[in-house]
Amino acid sequence: MKYILVTGGVISGIGKGIIASSVGTILKSCGLHVTSIKIDPYINIDAGTFSPYEHGEVFVLDDGGEVDLDLGNYERFLDIRLTKDNNLTTGKIYQYVINKERKGDYLGKTVQVVPHITDAIQEWVMRQALIPVDEDGLEPQVCVIELGGTVGDIESMPFIEAFRQFQFKVKRENFCNIHVSLVPQPSSTGEQKTKPTQNSVRELRGLGLSPDLVVCRCSNPLDTSVKEKISMFCHVEPEQVICVHDVSSIYRVPLLLEEQGVVDYFLRRLDLPIERQPRKMLMKWKEMADRYDRLLETCSIALVGKYTKFSDSYASVIKALEHSALAINHKLEIKYIDSADLEPITSQEEPVRYHEAWQKLCSAHGVLVPGGFGVRGTEGKIQAIAWARNQKKPFLGVCLGMQLAVVEFSRNVLGWQDANSTEFDPTTSHPVVVDMPEHNPGQMGGTMRLGKRRTLFQTKNSVMRKLYGDADYLEERHRHRFEVNPVWKKCLEEQGLKFVGQDVEGERMEIVELEDHPFFVGVQYHPEFLSRPIKPSPPYFGLLLASVGRLSHYLQKGCRLSPRDTYSDRSGSSSPDSEITELKFPSINHD
């Protein structure tokens, strides 16, 4: 097993996750099996109770693990399925060690950070690195480990110390360290500054880790003189200084690393059993990157949510939209709308914001209402859903978005003016959305319906069923405490709101579609978590197709895109492969 540790310096949020994912991608394209671990030095057990403003979105895994959004990057880049133990937090490690101490496993010893916490970290990494993450079930050969935060943070000290010991335990030829640092370029001088990187590497060396590659994040490509200066002061060869400047899309990052000889370096440094030249997989990335840069037509989607000031709050949603837009050869324009701005009360308090929000909504090609929690802004979302339904605008509601679509329909079509979710109005006489039996009101963490669940289609006459390849069922990831009340199902269906997908027991409403509408769909699950660059998520793909007016044509053709719309578009591509790469959708395994 080979281990690659990715650390960061100067500032957090520098792009360690994308660098780690890209390193994994180029190694996977060389034929290796790659897994990844994300270490978060916070004391929370998991990311489940975070505010989206605090740490971005909460990413959900197959096993129900609520984890850091970087694990979403790993899954999308490497097309793998991770588990909750691939996200290691200080809280998890301390809980693990304290539980062992309570059981008497330390035989009366004084339990300390060194060696007990550091040993537990090393054991966890070595154990988790061997868990298969690919569909073929083979054991990984390389484990990419991203250490969150920046070098020097007091929280990450036990982890740095653990890896200082770890490099000797697994031997030098099996461990290497990539250090990601910032090279700022102040606008006043226009000169690229190396001092932050020098200080960051010096601090890392002082803690006992020596970087093998120094990856410099910068706005423009590094000058040769700057590279040589970093090489001299950071005690690495010039070819070990890698420049990752700002690029048009993240699909370019693996290509950027490969062009600078990263594969050759790993080949020598880690003695990897691979060919020098990454093959077919990187050609797909090159095609995607080239294709992304050539897009001319634009499709605009109004994203009506609560956390729109911070795009990381909807990271997977945005990626799912991008994957689908790329698949139909369109540039994506997301119009972020704070749902509270659409509410009538805003028209009195801040009329300009109110009119700007409605202007954005009315000018969009499609409307998306993603998941969320809490009552703030829900009336604005209901207004947006009503507008999309009445104006025949393509609409997708995810999780809370689906629940509010049912609330809106109940109020405006069935005439139940007080219809609501018991989350927002516990005393309503028409509780069309109710909390689930699993929900434990006394505790917040881990009390939701989480992870991959099966949904069965109830009818053959369904747009969503066709988008999923006419399958009998689908398996997607969930994260919710509330659900549509099955008591009102008959009343809603009689008026045209059809529940075309339900859970295996037939008790939970999973997919809703409106008759006589171009595309009005709600899903209780979160399809964005399984979207991949080459395998877009069907609900998002349907929304994008409907938004550009191509959905009915696509369904008539048996759910096949025209050649100009698939990844077989090879204009300007020098790929040696002759086969056509069809667009794929999440695999449905029939038992």
UniProtKB/Swiss-Prot annotation:
It is found in: Cytoplasm, Cytosol. GO terms for cellular component: cytoophidium; cytoplasm; cytosol; membrane. One of its GO terms (biological process) is 'de novo' CTP biosynthetic process. Activated by GTP and inhibited by CTP. Widely expressed. Its EC number is 6.3.4.2. Induction: Up-regulated in T-cells and B-cells activated through the TCR and the BCR respectively (at protein level). InterPro entries: Class_I_gatase-like (IPR029062), CTP_synthase (IPR004468), CTP_synthase_N (IPR017456), GATASE (IPR017926), GATase1_CTP_Synthase (IPR033828), P-loop_NTPase (IPR027417). Pathway: Pyrimidine metabolism; CTP biosynthesis via de novo pathway; CTP from UDP: step 2/2. Keywords: Acetylation, ATP-binding, Cytoplasm, Glutamine amidotransferase, Immunity, Ligase, Nucleotide-binding, Phosphoprotein, Pyrimidine biosynthesis. GO terms for molecular function: ATP binding; CTP synthase activity; identical protein binding. The active site is at 399 (for gatase activity), 526 (for gatase activity), 528 (for gatase activity). Residues 569-578 have a biased composition (Low complexity). It catalyses: UTP + L-glutamine + ATP + H2O = CTP + L-glutamate + ADP + phosphate + 2 H(+). The modification Phosphoserine is found at residues 562, 568, 571, 573-575, 578, 587. Its main location: cytoplasm. The modification N6-acetyllysine is found at residue 100. Residues 562-591 are annotated as: Disordered. Changing residue 161 to K: Localizes to cystolic filament structures. Belongs to the CTP synthase family. This enzyme is involved in the de novo synthesis of CTP, a precursor of DNA, RNA and phospholipids. Catalyzes the ATP-dependent amination of UTP to CTP with either L-glutamine or ammonia as a source of nitrogen. This enzyme and its product, CTP, play a crucial role in the proliferation of activated lymphocytes and therefore in immunity. It is linked to Immunodeficiency 24: A life-threatening immunodeficiency, characterized by an impaired capacity of activated T and B cells to proliferate in response to antigen receptor-mediated activation. Patients have early onset of severe chronic viral infections, mostly caused by herpes viruses, including EBV and varicella zooster virus (VZV), and also suffer from recurrent encapsulated bacterial infections, a spectrum of infections typical of a combined deficiency of adaptive immunity. This is CTP synthase 1.
